[in-house]
Amino acid sequence: MLLEETLKSCPTVKRGDYEYFIHPISDGVPIVNPKLLREVATRIIKEVDFENIDKIVTAEAMGIPLVTTLSLYTDVPYVIMRKREYKLKGEIPVHQETGYSKGQLYLNGIEKGDRVLIVDDVISTGGTMIAIINALKKAGAEIKDIVCVIERGEGKKIVEEKTGYKIKTLVKLDVKDGKVVIL
């Protein structure tokens, strides 16, 4: 599959002791191939019962192309948790902590009882996913499904243990000696 092929051949960079992979789905560079985006969206659609979904939720930034594509295919609207405050009525701020940053995310556009699908590009530490889940719970949404395209590290396990929600992923990987390894 194209996702796995492009991951195996993507560049990596080392910052300190951590090796990052640079890929169109996770970084938007060097270029996002529409065939890759279609493949990922189609694979997510096969994993989720969209009949029971009112809204798709992601955090900015790299979840945005994913939820846009999914929305176009399924006619389900999407909501983006933003990194800046808009001060809209009912806006829910939530703390986000990842392996490389700390900050706030802000949720708008979710109403009590909304049945939601959470989609994100990568789950590694689990910090972003925990923030999304916490915000949706505060809003009174019903989390029906969670899909992350790429799994790396222990984040999936951490989120599942802390929240009780199961997370589906399309591919699990690690970076070893400057190369992406599909697990």
From Swiss-Prot:
Function per UniProt: Catalyzes a salvage reaction resulting in the formation of IMP that is energically less costly than de novo synthesis.
Transmembrane segments: none
CC terms in the record's Gene Ontology section: cytoplasm
Assigned EC number: 2.4.2.8
Catalytic activity: IMP + diphosphate = hypoxanthine + 5-phospho-alpha-D-ribose 1-diphosphate; GMP + diphosphate = guanine + 5-phospho-alpha-D-ribose 1-diphosphate
Subcellular location field: Cytoplasm
Keyword Acetylation appears in the UniProt entry: no
NCBIfam families assigned: HPT_Archaea, PRK02304.1-4
Species: Methanotorris igneus (strain DSM 5666 / JCM 11834 / Kol 5)
Signal peptide: none
Protein name (record): Hypoxanthine/guanine phosphoribosyltransferase
Gene Ontology molecular functions: guanine phosphoribosyltransferase activity; hypoxanthine phosphoribosyltransferase activity
Pathway: Purine metabolism; IMP biosynthesis via salvage pathway; IMP from hypoxanthine: step 1/1
This protein's UniProt keywords: Cytoplasm, Glycosyltransferase, Purine salvage, Transferase
Pfam families assigned to the protein according to its UniProt record, in alphabetical order: Pribosyltran (PF00156)
Subunit: Homodimer.
Gene Ontology biological-process annotations: IMP salvage; purine ribonucleoside salvage
Top-level lineage group: Archaea
Family indicated by similarity: Belongs to the purine/pyrimidine phosphoribosyltransferase family. Archaeal HPRT subfamily.
